[in-house]
From Swiss-Prot:
Keywords: Cell membrane, Iron, Membrane, Metal-binding, Monooxygenase, Oxidoreductase, Ubiquinone biosynthesis. Catalyzes the hydroxylation of 2-nonaprenyl-3-methyl-6-methoxy-1,4-benzoquinol during ubiquinone biosynthesis. It catalyses: a 5-methoxy-2-methyl-3-(all-trans-polyprenyl)benzene-1,4-diol + AH2 + O2 = a 3-demethylubiquinol + A + H2O. Pathway: Cofactor biosynthesis; ubiquinone biosynthesis. Belongs to the COQ7 family. Its cofactor is Fe cation. The gene is coq7. It comes from the Bacteria. GO terms for molecular function: 3-demethoxyubiquinol 3-hydroxylase activity; metal ion binding. This is 3-demethoxyubiquinol 3-hydroxylase.
């Protein structure tokens, strides 16, 4: 049973890094069609933002895989599995949009994945309440990060905006579920460290 689970998660990790993601929901589409073409500068900026979002989803896969494998209770395992499934949609959506923008994922994805996997294992070994609290805080920070992207994306890039808006809805749901399941609030130093690490990742992934 444990071996089967490890093989399954290894397969998911490979798919995350190779871009072969399974999409359970279609790519969100804007309510109204895009009016006008993006300028080269707007296209480049949108691609940078969507690359950052794609990296975030690579990290989410690693985090939730590690937290699922280290979770003590069946209910916590199920929660991390459900979140990972929805985040895999996000991974596929952002990869799809990057292709539409004639861009590419981050060249450092293996590094981001490995780091997030280690962090997920560390959080999981501290117990389910801490691990769920880490999930809740992660989702809160991602929600804030997506709000920032919605304010930065060109108004005419309705395709990217539709994806980010649905991602935000899902992240809010994941964070609330983790809190409702008993996740504790992390101490301030831990939250600040998470924000600092996130800034390094987002600034680097925008270009690389």
């Amino acid at each position: 049973m444990v071996l089967d689970e490890l093989i399954s998660e290894f397969d998911r990790g490979l798919r995350s890094l190779t871009g072969i993601s399974r999409m359970s929901r279609p790519v969100p589409v804007p309510a109204e069609p895009t009016v006008g073409e993006l300028t080269p500068a707007e296209r480049a900026h949108a691609a940078g933002l969507m690359r950052v979002n794609h990296v975030g989803e690579v990290c989410a896969q690693a985090l939730y895989q590690a937290q699922k494998l280290t979770a003590r209770s069946a209910s916590s395992k199920a929660m991390f599995e459900e979140a990972a499934r929805e985040e895999e949609d996000h991974l596929a959506w952002t990869a799809h949009r990057l292709k539409e923008l004639d861009s590419r994922p981050s060249l450092l994805n293996p590094l981001w994945y490995a780091g997030a996997l280690a962090i997920g294992v560390a959080a999981g070994t501290l117990g389910d309440k801490v691990s769920l609290g880490f999930m809740a805080e992660t989702e809160r920070q991602v929600e804030s990060h997506l709000d920032g992207h919605l304010s930065e994306l060109p108004a005419t890039d309705t395709a990217s905006r539709a994806i980010v808006e649905q991602m935000r809805v899902d992240e809010v749901k994941h964070g609330k579920a983790a809190t409702d399941a008993g996740g504790i609030e992390l101490p301030l130093p831990a939250r600040m460290l998470m924000r600092a690490a996130s800034k390094v990742m987002t600034r680097t992934a925008y270009y690389l």
